[in-house]
């Protein structure tokens, strides 16, 4: 199964249309009944998430009727879909509103993510910023590109390697338990500056475009990471799980680090993740 250039254009249009029709009209316009907690007060779902995922899913089913479709919000109804990514002939993975906590709070740091996998390999990824209208598109073997709302396009490139005390990056330790949580958060004092966006879309956008040296996560849900990892790799970076093995569709544990190159990855693994 191959994905054509026309398919990529179609996927970009799907994401942008969902953002235009379902997400942005509800941004800073949510009622009390439009927001619900999933597992905690910081794990939310809104009507924008549900309706955007439904719109994208419907469009994908019409064009690719035999494909596996994995949506973050539909996952609770059928959790077998994530392991099935490991060998699905063709699959699409949707995060309709990545950064829902920010979205619900009225903070314009959220995105829509769509990844394409073929037989356990990510072959394309789209990360869209509904607020700015900008889109990152990554195609395996062809690079990663940022396309502005006005149509201007630039190829992405990761940051140059730097010494640890000059690095800017972030490790999401919210899903970690002690002692890992305390050790890693303390080790972040070794770098120049850290941050927390609470939004994988913008984190991968920043690290793939060279604005950050590294990012890391403990929880590996595919809608958060598949498209971003591909964009980072196509921009020249090195991404691997904490044990050094490649991150593959269907995997949800083991932690992940994205860095400018393998040497930088090993430095971060040793000095920041530790243990």
Regions from the PLM with identified roles:
Residues 1-97:
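N-terminal subdomain of lithium-sensitive/metallo-dependent phosphomonoesterases centered on the IMPase/IPPase/PAP
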């Amino acid at each position: 199964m191959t994905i054509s250039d026309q398919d990529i254009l179609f996927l970009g249009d799907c994401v942008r249309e969902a953002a235009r029709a379902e997400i942005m009209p509800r941004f800073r316009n949510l009622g009390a009944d439009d927001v619900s907690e999933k597992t905690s007060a910081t794990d939310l779902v809104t009507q924008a998430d549900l309706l955007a995922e439904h719109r994208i899913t419907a469009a994908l089913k019409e064009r690719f009727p035999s494909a596996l479709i994995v949506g973050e919000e539909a996952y609770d109804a059928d959790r077998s879909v994530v392991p099935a990514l490991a060998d699905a002939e063709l699959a699409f993975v949707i995060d309709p509103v990545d950064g829902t906590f920010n979205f619900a709070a009225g903070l314009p740091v959220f995105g829509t993510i769509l990844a394409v996998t073929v037989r356990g390999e990510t072959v394309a990824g789209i990360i869209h910023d509904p607020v700015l209208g900008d889109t990152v598109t990554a195609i395996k073997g062809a690079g990663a590109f940022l396309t502005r709302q006005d149509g201007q396009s630039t190829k992405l490139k990761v940051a140059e390697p730097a010494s640890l005390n000059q690095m800017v990056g972030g490790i999401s330790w919210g899903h970690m338990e002690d002692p890992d949580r305390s050790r890693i958060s303390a080790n972040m004092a070794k770098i120049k500056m850290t941050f927390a966006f609470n939004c994988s879309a913008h984190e991968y956008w920043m690290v793939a475009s060279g604005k950050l040296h590294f990012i890391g996560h403990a929880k590996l849900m595919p809608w958060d990471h598949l498209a971003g990892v591909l964009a980072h790799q196509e921009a020249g970076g090195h991404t691997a799980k904490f044990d050094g093995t490649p991150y593959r569709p269907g995997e949800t544990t083991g932690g992940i680090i994205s860095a400018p190159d393998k040497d930088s990855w090993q430095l971060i693994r040793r000095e920041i993740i530790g243990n």
